[in-house]
């Protein structure tokens, strides 16, 4: 007998954890640390993009069934990357290659997690 590991509650937990990490980094960690080292600024800025992508993928996919999750996650990642590229033209921010990299890494890790979550396991 094969049992799928997929659960809406699991996807919700991962998504809400991603949102909590975004708020934690933005409103708690950044203000407490007054270090303006370039590496620190890059890591903190890109980590928000990373966790926001993870949150978007898992919260949106928690409302779908198991089929097509990888394709849906791929479209979400491409949408996040497209948004990063058009931000300067919309007047909403600046283009940052490190954010694109963080989004790509988050998408890869999320799709790997999704593929493991919906795979069948022998009991």
Model features per residue range: what roles?
Residues 1-123:
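Bulky hydrophobic segments
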């Amino acid at each position: 007998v094969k049992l799928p590991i997929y659960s809406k509650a699991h996807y919700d937990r991962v998504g809400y954890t991603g949102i909590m990490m975004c708020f934690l980094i933005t409103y708690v960690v950044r203000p407490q640390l007054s270090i303006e080292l370039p590496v620190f600024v890059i890591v903190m800025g890109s980590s928000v993009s990373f966790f926001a992508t993870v949150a978007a993928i898992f919260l949106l996919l928690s409302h779908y069934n198991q089929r097509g999750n990888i394709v849906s996650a791929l479209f979400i990642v491409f949408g996040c990357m497209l948004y990063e590229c058009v931000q300067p033209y919309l007047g909403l921010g600046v283009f940052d290659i490190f954010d694109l990299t963080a989004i790509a890494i988050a998408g890869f890790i999320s799709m790997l997690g999704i593929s493991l979550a919906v795979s069948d396991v022998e009991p």
